[in-house]
Amino acid sequence: MSAQPAHLCFRSFVEALKVDNDLVEINTPIDPNLEAAAITRRVCETNDKAPLFNNLIGMKNGLFRILGAPGSLRKSSADRYGRLARHLALPPTASMREILDKMLSASDMPPIPPTIVPTGPCKENSLDDSEFDLTELPVPLIHKSDGGKYIQTYGMHIVQSPDGTWTNWSIARAMVHDKNHLTGLVIPPQHIWQIHQMWKKEGRSDVPWALAFGVPPAAIMASSMPIPDGVTEAGYVGAMTGSSLELVKCDTNDLYVPATSEIVLEGTLSISETGPEGPFGEMHGYIFPGDTHLGAKYKVNRITYRNNAIMPMSSCGRLTDETHTMIGSLAAAEIRKLCQQNDLPITDAFAPFESQVTWVALRVDTEKLRAMKTTSEGFRKRVGDVVFNHKAGYTIHRLVLVGDDIDVYEGKDVLWAFSTRCRPGMDETLFEDVRGFPLIPYMGHGNGPAHRGGKVVSDALMPTEYTTGRNWEAADFNQSYPEDLKQKVLDNWTKMGFSN
């Protein structure tokens, strides 16, 4: 197999990070028990380079190295989203809007089916169920109060509907349970949950399953996106990248995995057995010690892997890691598309990182809004009904409506508009009879039902934006001064002694 581009091969992606000077290779021994995750967490909180741990304590027979923070932010504003851009064959300087447009591009294209190849790098090594013990692998303990060692934070579950018409790729956390089992979170409305329910209804056998780590970066991005039910991600990724993904058949079931995957676990997802799962330090920045529940149980029958394999790891928590840059951002992209499909005048959507991606700010074309002859109350209700009753809005609990003057990709601009234009209560509509996201602390550990309600549309449009247009100017550099004076200030900025 010839060398593949970075967006189609995880190993090439790691090399691309090195070329970008966005990789730190750590060759000294690092303990997977908290130390690797602590370094990665510090990277996420400082937007530093991605760490590649080449010498994990407990490595054996090439299993495995760890790459931390594969989709987190870079320090420089010029290429802040460069790691995500590398997932999609975009320039490292791509904006978030360009990244999300790329992710949405395939929704209007015919899928490009994958190409089945006889073998691939993921078949370079293999272990059957008598040759491995998951508890002896260098699986990271990511937070000190986690309920177990979470092997699955950035891998891709692969399951198929019983009739074979829908193959789903998704990310859902999973931890080591014993020598050949994992337990994980499988909850509605996840696609893996939907397919699990189909197999349970048939009741004939457990769900054939694979978990692939270090998959093509474009594939892991698609796996994070709330694309419509029944859509097979392999074809979506093909359309998005313009090339057919190469897949190989699993050894122990009839599923197919990306040929360049770093590590593949093959087995089954039980339709009857469960096991203790959690707690885990999740995307909203909290862990609740002792908060263990029964989770879905996976049986691992075989492991195949590349030489000197690399396991990607997300050290989830407070800002900013992959759960924010990908889960929140991609939900917002799908919400933008959903609103436009429902003839709502939304031009942009983004989940502000400052909200721990529990909000999505919606930029409204106010000229089209005025043509609708609607009211704030009516518009709030219509937007909330569309978004909160759709899978794309599942993880989002506040929609903030803003005008054309607000850049939704700048959190400080969204917070300014929300704080100064939305009157609490009067300019808001609550939604209590919709599906809620129990992982948000105020849902799962607060007042009220964990799985219902707790959602709101907050209107940060001023009343005149519905009628005659803006009647104010921002008291800022851009709007409070003449163009010639602004240019003079900028031309002389460094000469006056200010930093560039």
From Swiss-Prot:
Binding sites annotated in the UniProt record for prenylated FMN: 168-173, 190-191, 233, 391
Active site residues per record: 282
Keywords on record: Cytoplasm, Decarboxylase, Flavoprotein, FMN, Lyase, Manganese, Metal-binding
Any one GO BP annotation for this protein: styrene metabolic process
Record-given protein name: Ferulic acid decarboxylase 1
Tagged with keyword Nucleotide-binding: no
Species of provenance: Aspergillus niger (strain ATCC MYA-4892 / CBS 513.88 / FGSC A1513)
Family, as annotated: Belongs to the UbiD family. UbiD-like/FDC subfamily.
Alphabetical list of InterPro entries matching this protein: FDC-like (IPR032903), UbiD (IPR002830), UbiD-like_C (IPR049381), UbiD-like_N (IPR049383), UbiD_Rift_dom (IPR048304)
Positions of Mn(2+) binding: 168, 191, 233
Enzyme type, top EC level: lyase
GO molecular function terms attached to this record: carboxy-lyase activity; identical protein binding; manganese ion binding
